[in-house]
Amino acid sequence: MIITNEIARRSKAGGLFFFVILPVALTIYFTAIYIGAAHGQAWALHNQTYVHMNSWFHYAKLYAATFGCIGFMILKYHWGKLGKAYWFKCFPFVIVAINIFIAVGSDFESAIRGMNALQTTGSQWWLSSEGVWLYGGWWNVLNGIAGIINVFCMTGWWAIYSSKNEDDMLWPDMIWLFILAYDVWNFEYTYSNLPTHSWYCGVALLLAPTFAAAIWNKGVWIQNRANTLAIWCMFAQVIPEFQDSGRFAVLPVLYKNGVMNPAVHPGAADPTMMGVITILSLVINVVVFAIIWKRATSKGINPYTHEVFVGTKDYEEAMARAQK
């Protein structure tokens, strides 16, 4: 993920390949699969993408992340009227908020389905359209609320800059506080709603952009996140069995018996970690939100139309890279 992110961010050709050419080709591929499935073609009905990655969430996430990457390229390269328009600088906030709300909706869906399953089967296990048993409950509701708060932990919505060499789109006011709040919230989302993928799209996929932003790519966490997320979603949509079966498959402790078989209703569950992490997610997001408003109030500013973290180490290091 780190390597592909570097290729995509350092050249226009790399960015256009990963976020325009490849998505167009994959869209044609996905369309062909669903047309084939609609006509009862065996190759389509048994295709990995059709069997394991058919939920609304995965497609929404893939295309929302990809549109984000394209928008970030427009901003950092100042392409056309959009790339030079002041109003378009809030695009990163809008697309990130959309991505968060997609996950929030999925969290609430899992809670509702878990409660419905409890009424009908006496268990909170419910089977997703992709053949994964999920365990919906109050942790989904609390994490959904944490996600909504996380949206409003983004500050300085119009304070978007291009780096001096135009490799990067900078959001200097998005410092480590937001990154921490987002990472914990998003990990809890993947742990609860994509449990069989949580090692990859949870731990690894969150560490990749955070590592890059912390070490060499200051102020660019959101671009790193969008790039790695979009590229991973494309890979996982085409080759989902990489993480679903075989030596690379990982199951969380939720599956108390250590088995996830779509044909067999699970018995025992251990949702303890989901509860612990979701409480941590909610607490961290509330604390970050409070810090933001405390700083904004002391400065007498609106934290969404103005930058809140001017003067902090993260902010100043990012601004040192910005075009003046």
Each PLM stretch: what is its role?
Residues 1-2, 60-76, 142-158, 204-210, ...:
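Hydrophobic cores of alpha-helical transmembrane segments in multi-pass inner/ER membrane proteins
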Residues 1-40, 136-183, 274-285:
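Alpha-helical transmembrane segments and their cytosolic membrane-interface
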Residues 11-14, 81-85, 132-135, 139-142, ...:
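Short, structured coil/loop segments at alpha-helix boundaries
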Residues 21-41, 70-76, 93-110, 175-192, ...:
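Hydrophobic alpha-helical transmembrane segments and adjacent interfacial helices
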Residues 1-91, 95:
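An N-terminal, globular interaction/scaffold subdomain
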Residues 1-2, 201-323:
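C-terminal transmembrane-bundle signature of multipass membrane proteins
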Residues 39-54, 109-135, 246-269:
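Membrane-interfacial helical/loop segments at transmembrane boundaries in membrane proteins
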Residues 86-219:
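Generic multipass alpha-helical transmembrane bundles of integral membrane proteins
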